[in-house]
Amino acid sequence: DKVITFLGRITMQKGPEYFVEAAHKVLQHTDGIRFVMAGNGDMMDKMIDLVARKRIADRFHFTGFLRGRQVYEMLRSSDVYVMPSVSEPFGISPLEAMQCGVPSIISKQSGCAEILRYAIKTDYWDVDAMADAMHALVSYPTLHEHLKQKGLEEVNNIVWSKAGLRLRAIYDRLV
């Protein structure tokens, strides 16, 4: 089975219900996919209930809170990472996923959407687009491999010193 993962706090800010809704749509048309919700938070019970009501509990796994090495083990065992955040000043987890060679789907509302070129971006509320992106990444190996390779190159080139130099150049042009 392919594994599609949500990893983060299970809170309203992170948009876990959109992940579940998109997963439900994918599972209506596609077999051989498992979904993982890794983390904990005040919406955990609500998400477990939603998964049960959607009748997809047999394809869903809740890990609870992960730390340190467990996070990277989870990412490395994933085929796709999804960050459907409603509000996210930056969001470093897609970079961690991409560094592990895992293509990412992120919300356009996250800060990292402004800098990542090789992640698929959807509006957090557009569960149809999110489901389409999930389906595409597990169904089209060429697309998956392209985003895996380009994403890895992209995150390996994100260096704080380069970002600082670019920021300084912008500042110098303005002054």
Label for each model-derived stretch:
Residues P103-I106:
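Short hydrophobic beta-strand element within catalytic cores of glycosyltransferases
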Residues D1-K14, V20-A23, V36:
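Conserved donor-binding/catalytic core segment of Leloir-type glycosyltransferases
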Residues I48-L66:
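Nucleotide-activated donor-binding/catalytic signature segment of Leloir-type glycosyltransferases, i.e.
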Residues T142-D172:
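A charged, aromatic-enriched C-terminal amphipathic alpha-helix characteristic of glycosyltransferases
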Residues G91-P94, C112:
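Short glycine/serine-rich donor-binding loops of glycosyltransferases
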Residues V86:
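Aromatic "clamp/platform" in nucleotide-sugar-dependent glycosyltransferases that forms part
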Residues F65-L66, E73-S78:
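Short alpha-helical donor nucleotide-sugar binding micro-motif in glycosyltransferases
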Residues A119-D128, A136-P141:
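Conserved acidic donor-binding segment of nucleotide-sugar-dependent glycosyltransferases
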